[in-house]
């Protein structure tokens, strides 16, 4: 994992209508909600994040955003990051990794890391 090109992430995210915010509850369960992230500087902001999402982020700051593709051959945009849920109006996420991901047309060689079609941003 290196530095995330937030400008590239914002550019790609503009082609999607919404994202899924994935958080972990204090009881170690996955919670998913539909969100409309915005990009401010080097931070991804999720305005109007639910109380549950903010509570989860306070307990487990590691979160993911997934923008699904319009069709099954398209790329999903996946952003992992560290969330700050202190603001009641929005969840702020510092991205730590971002990729475009889709199933590979042909599987890659075993042991080659991601055997899918992945593009680091």
Residue ranges and their predicted role:
Residues 1-18:
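Short, basic/aromatic recognition patches
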